[in-house]
């Protein structure tokens, strides 16, 4: 069966033919390739076409597809352990590794996804503070938990919808919306309802309305307001953890969050998530405290082995981050040069190995409102051109591109050559 045949048959058994909406390429007006295999940064579809991958499973594969050390760990563990629903040494090893190597992490709880991590962190914050309301920011995406599906980023933003059917108003009545990088608005919000706020959750580097780094003074204001009103500050590092730096995005700011969520890279390509923070807060979790959260597959030994292999390799080869920064800078500078030479309005936001191309006339993209000025029709033309040229990029103006340690300068040169052909056609 070829790509089209598989996808058409998939529609008979899966809604839209996919298990996550953005994969169907609906907003791009085309069918997706059906991926068969991947190694390093090269993936191959069922038609036999190869692509240089800049999606990397939406961020987890910093080491590239099927890294030999990660695959070895998975194979060795799976020969003797798949799942027990019981304590294992591997979950201790990964938990200890993260607590000892990350800042502001005294204790950690393993879960199975980023959504589980963020929803559990919010529950814990509510249990710890005894308050109900949370603040999230328009354009930020924290998973598909009901309380987050309002003014969300990622696929919700891509499809141009305000939220989701099936989410009753009661589920979001305790969710307050902040404006990213707007100190005045967040101060007013706290002034009116600060005593009811349990937590502020934020992507310190947003990745689901495109890449936007929070302003330093904005993050400091959040920390100050949370301290003043007795709320917790939660950094959602599902995307940025171990990516923008080994210790994550919190190293970019002189700020200490109370809770941090992780996923993606920490699982080495397998389903994984975690939330972590100060001991006094984490011990409110059952069985130590009264905040209940559980999971049959949490701490799964195969996943723990993949995560431990991934993070250990990154720690022991910290220079890999310098390589990612180098090729990221080369890509960014090359794209800007080409766009200027061909009068294609373009802003590129990049933090380490994640970046977004914003097709906009603005001089900078720093807020959710800025993002909404982007030329989606031009992005669609760019996407289709690059896919035809053999590059896998996210099918949305509002998602990040990801780089890996396996990308080379040659891969970047090929991408720039293809982008130049696109830009010339846009004249």
From Swiss-Prot:
GO biological process: protoporphyrinogen IX biosynthetic process
Compartmental location: Cytoplasm
Catalyzed chemical reaction(s): (S)-4-amino-5-oxopentanoate = 5-aminolevulinate
UniProt cofactor(s): pyridoxal 5'-phosphate
GO molecular function, one term: pyridoxal phosphate binding
The EC number(s) this enzyme carries: 5.4.3.8
InterPro entries (alphabetical): 4pyrrol_synth_GluAld_NH2Trfase, Aminotrans_3, Aminotrans_3_PPA_site, PyrdxlP-dep_Trfase, PyrdxlP-dep_Trfase_major, PyrdxlP-dep_Trfase_small
Keywords, in A-Z order: Cytoplasm, Isomerase, Porphyrin biosynthesis, Pyridoxal phosphate
Pathway the protein takes part in: Porphyrin-containing compound metabolism; protoporphyrin-IX biosynthesis; 5-aminolevulinate from L-glutamyl-tRNA(Glu): step 2/2
Pfam families according to UniProt: Aminotran_3
SUPFAM superfamilies according to UniProt: PLP-dependent transferases
Positions of post-translational N6-(pyridoxal phosphate)lysine modification: 264
Quaternary structure and partners: Homodimer.
Family of the protein in this entry: Belongs to the class-III pyridoxal-phosphate-dependent aminotransferase family. HemL subfamily.
Record-given protein name: Glutamate-1-semialdehyde 2,1-aminomutase
